[in-house]
């Protein structure tokens, strides 16, 4: 749980007493490689804070084609947010790509934390704002950048993922073929 405290204190300071009251809202879960945290059609009960591991958030279209929305690693938050915030069935899958550990937070727990602790409301607001910014940047990149620019941006922003995530998934995330990614990778 010390990872959680450090993560919170990157944004706001909390006392030992406050942290003792915050901890029970989170549960720790160990996750095996290729284990799902969320699958399409299931309820998305939790938002997850990654303690360790690499995860892939994706959906499968009606033809079975995978569309990767996000990779997530240490200190990143992830879920199927449409399902989580609306308490509906998931459209996304969250799959562990490397054995890991996450902290799980229910929507009810999140709301109670935000109402009880103004510092946590501030923390969640900052995290949500950062998520919006990242999402908008990803959309702009997909709409206006060429494959080379998207690859360079990904490599600069996520150098640890370039080495750990299989190339086929990076290609899917960038919206390019595996062959195009190979050319980009060898040219950098």
Sequence positions of predicted segments:
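Short, Lys/Arg-enriched N-terminal segment that forms or immediately precedes the first helix
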Residues: 4-6, 131-140
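Phosphate-/nucleic-acid-contacting segments
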Residues: 145-188
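Cyclic nucleotide-binding regulatory module and flanking cytosolic helices
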Residues: 1-27
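Cyclic-nucleotide recognition modules
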Residues: 68-125
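Glycine- and acidic-residue-biased ligand/ion/polar-headgroup-sensing regions
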Residues: 34, 45-56, 74-75
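His/acidic/aromatic-lined binding-pocket segments of jelly-roll/cupin-type domains
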Residues: 28-29, 45-50, 69-70, 173
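Short phosphate-coordinating micro-motif centered on Lys-Gly-acidic
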Residues: 37-42
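Short beta-strand segments in beta-sandwich/barrel cores
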Residues: 27, 36, 54-59, 101-102
């Amino acid at each position: 749980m010390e990872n959680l405290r450090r993560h919170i204190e990157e944004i706001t300071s909390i006392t030992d007493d406050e942290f003792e009251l915050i901890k029970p809202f989170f549960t720790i879960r160990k996750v095996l490689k290729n284990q799902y945290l969320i699958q399409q059609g299931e309820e998305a009960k939790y938002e997850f804070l990654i303690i360790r591991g690499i995860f892939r958030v994706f959906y499968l279209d009606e033809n079975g084609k995978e569309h990767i929305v996000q990779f997530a690693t240490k200190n990143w938050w992830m879920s199927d947010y449409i399902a989580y915030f609306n308490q509906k069935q998931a459209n996304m899958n969250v799959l562990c790509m490397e054995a890991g550990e996450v902290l799980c937070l229910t929507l009810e727990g999140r709301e109670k934390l935000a109402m009880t602790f103004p510092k946590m409301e501030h923390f969640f607001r900052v995290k949500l704002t950062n998520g919006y910014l990242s999402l908008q940047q990803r959309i702009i990149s997909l709409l206006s950048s060429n494959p080379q620019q998207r690859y360079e941006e990904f490599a600069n922003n996520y150098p640890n993922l370039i080495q750990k995530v299989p190339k086929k998934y990076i290609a899917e995330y960038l919206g390019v073929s595996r062959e195009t990614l190979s050319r980009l990778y060898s040219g950098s």
